[in-house]
Amino acid sequence: SQSSEYKELIETNQAQLEQVESEIRAAIASASRGSGSISGSTGNGSGELGYPTDSRSISAGYPNYSSGGYHGGIDFPVRTGSNVYAAASGKVILVKYLNYSYGRYIIIDHGNGLSTLYAHNSSIEVSVGDKVSRGQVIAHSGSTGNSTGPHCHFEVRVNGSRVNPNNYL
């Protein structure tokens, strides 16, 4: 029946998301070994991180449950092909393409337990192991994966857990 197919699809999507989250946490944990850790927030709008796009407009805030699931970042609506910038200096620890979830995404480790994720890119300009500088172009925006239109989905993680990006911008 249609309802059993729908239930199966939901279960498959949930399993895929759990696998993605597990891989992300493992990459962050591996990169963070020996670099110390931080706890808590740096304060509202600390400026510790730069904006990942030229746009300051936010189309989906943190957290957002309106789509029926958890949205653990903020979305910057931009045209496909717009520059996506490293929010701070660091090392690229994960570059991946999925036809679901984040689509083409990047994770940068900034040390001391702080990392950033940039998703739904049309192209990626860096590789795992690359050192990047704050403001460096790391990707071009798109609408890959589960996306409602071109934007940059941006997450900040502390010790692997998502936190409110607005506290760091």
Q: What spans do the regions from the language model cover?
A:
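Catalytic cores of peptidoglycan-degrading enzymes
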Residues: 45-169
